[in-house]
């Protein structure tokens, strides 16, 4: 566990996301996309250079030194996003079986727990880049494919000591899909109960509406359930004029309140959070002052999330330095470990 407040240490763990590795996001690795107009993994894999570049990326973005670094800095939990194509090609997507097997071997070696996150469903669950394909939301047409993908992942990794849990969807679009999501969650939980070892978590997502989904699944004996909530505050100009302290007070009202109101009924994790502040707050600030502001907002958020079972920083690293790069924040002393 990463050192935070004393109460946070008692109640919850802190981990990181390994985003941008096995599911691409252009903003995280822009050099990979250089020379293409591709905005997502689907369009990138249809380019002439896609297949060769992605293979190199998968084999170099995360290496054993990264797993060692995590262990050396007391990061014992990672959330690992994958697409429905993780174990089987579905043109133009190429499977990541080799890298995923290796990731579990590394996690076992360094005693790190993996939350395996089905980040991208066939047909896209939200139409955004991190679902694999920008555009239409058509996952309901391919629901069985998603259930099959979950089952195959569970079958392959259920005996690994590193498997902490499986997350069945990431940030689904709620409008027009609420009833379908409840059905999918129930069906996915049924599938996983038939495969996973007792004690392995099934994790579902609240689609940014925790009060709506709290209690959506009732836990069966020996097969624990967690709800995943993500906390990203939109940055309207009005908020950007606030001090970081006042900005975080708004976060506290929204986030701590949501956790308090839902956690009694539905244990949860904060699957994604970060130190991101509106750029206007950091404009013309010396680097030392900027890092101090980021460090302070991180500590305030740690206190906000102490009622959650755990929290995963987005992201472990990106191509560039900055607020989404956990490793660089540790190495600059902004995050204390």
At which residue positions do the language-model features occur?
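Hydrophobic faces of well-ordered beta-strands that scaffold small-molecule active sites
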Residues: 12-18, 78-80, 114-118, 164-166, ...
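Aromatic- and acidic-residue-enriched segments that line the glycan-binding/catalytic groove
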Residues: 26-39, 92-95, 123-141, 329-330
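Extracellular glycoside hydrolase catalytic/binding regions
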Residues: 155-158, 162-165, 169-303, 307
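N-terminal carbohydrate-binding accessory modules
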Residues: 1-75
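Short acidic/His/Gly/Ser-rich catalytic and metal-binding motifs that mark active-site loops
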Residues: 86-89, 122-131, 237, 277-280
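A short acidic, glycine-rich active-site loop
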Residues: 48-60, 134-144, 246-255, 291-292
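Aromatic-rich peripheral "rim/lid" segments of glycoside hydrolase catalytic domains that contact
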Residues: 287-337
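An active-site-proximal structural segment forming one wall of the substrate-binding cleft
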Residues: 55-78, 88, 92-120, 130-165, ...
């Amino acid at each position: 566990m990463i050192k935070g407040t004393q109460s946070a240490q008692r109640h919850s763990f802190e981990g990181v996301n390994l985003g941008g590795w096995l599911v691409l996001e252009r903003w995280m690795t822009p050099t990979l996309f250089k020379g293409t107009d591709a905005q997502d993994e689907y369009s990138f894999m249809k380019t002439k250079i896609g297949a060769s570049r992605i293979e190199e990326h998968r084999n170099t973005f995360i290496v054993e030194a990264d797993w060692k670094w995590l262990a050396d800095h007391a990061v014992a939990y990672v959330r690992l996003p994958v697409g429905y194509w993780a174990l089987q090609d579905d043109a133009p997507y190429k499977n990541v079986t080799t890298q995923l097997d290796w990731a579990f071997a590394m996690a076992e070696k360094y005693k790190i727990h993996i939350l395996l996150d089905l980040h991208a469903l066939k047909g896209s669950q939200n139409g955004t880049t991190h679902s694999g394909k920008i555009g239409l939301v058509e996952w309901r047409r391919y629901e069985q494919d998603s259930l099959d993908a979950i089952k195959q992942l569970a079958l392959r990794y259920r005996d690994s000591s590193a498997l902490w849990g499986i997350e069945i969807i990431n940030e689904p679009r709620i409008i027009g899909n609420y009833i379908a999501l409840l059905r999918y969650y129930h069906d996915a939980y049924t599938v996983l109960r038939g495969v996973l070892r007792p004690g392995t978590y099934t994790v579902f997502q609240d689609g940014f509406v925790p009060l709506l989904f709290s209690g959506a699944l009732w836990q069966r004996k020996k097969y624990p359930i967690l709800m995943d909530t993500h906390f990203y505050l939109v940055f309207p100009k009005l908020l950007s004029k606030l001090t970081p302290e006042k900005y975080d007070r708004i976060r506290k009202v929204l986030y701590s309140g949501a956790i308090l109101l839902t956690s009694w009924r539905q244990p949860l994790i904060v699957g994604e959070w970060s130190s991101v502040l509106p750029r206007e707050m950091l404009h013309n600030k010396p680097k030392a002052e900027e890092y101090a502001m980021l460090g302070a907002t991180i500590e305030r958020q740690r206190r906000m999330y102490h009622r959650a079972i755990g929290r995963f920083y987005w992201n472990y690293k990106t191509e560039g330095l900055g607020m989404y790069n956990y490793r660089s924040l540790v190495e600059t002393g902004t995050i204390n470990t």
